[in-house]
Amino acid sequence: MAKQSMKAREVKRVALADKYFAKRAELKAIISDVNASDEERWNAVLKLQTLPRDSSPSRQRNRCRQTGRPHGFLRKFGLSRIKVREAAMRGEIPGLKKASW
């Protein structure tokens, strides 16, 4: 199990990314716009740097909903490989069965 503080940190990062998504997209559009003046682009870079680091979506980490485990995460289920296997063995995931050939 991951520490509660780690789970809370991830929740905070998701909230910040949602809050600043439009602002970040607007600034990045100005930065990548070739028609914008150099000064305008530089100001956009400086403004982007003032935003919180955790507002960047690339700082988010997928974690298991049950345990908070960051590795072995399966997006389809939102769980780690261990919890997916446990749920599959109990028959809690419809349509999922153990491979046999």
From Swiss-Prot:
Keywords: Ribonucleoprotein, Ribosomal protein, RNA-binding, rRNA-binding. The keyword RNA-binding applies. GO terms for molecular function: rRNA binding; structural constituent of ribosome. InterPro entries: Ribosomal_uS14, Ribosomal_uS14_bac/plastid, Ribosomal_uS14_CS. The keyword Ribosomal protein applies. Transmembrane segments: none annotated. GO terms for cellular component: cytoplasm; small ribosomal subunit. Pfam families: Ribosomal_S14 (PF00253). One of its GO terms (biological process) is translation. HAMAP family: Ribosomal_uS14_1. NCBIfam families: PRK08881.1. Part of the 30S ribosomal subunit. Contacts proteins S3 and S10. Binds 16S rRNA, required for the assembly of 30S particles and may also be responsible for determining the conformation of the 16S rRNA at the A site. Belongs to the universal ribosomal protein uS14 family. This is Small ribosomal subunit protein uS14. It comes from Escherichia coli O8 (strain IAI1). The gene is rpsN.
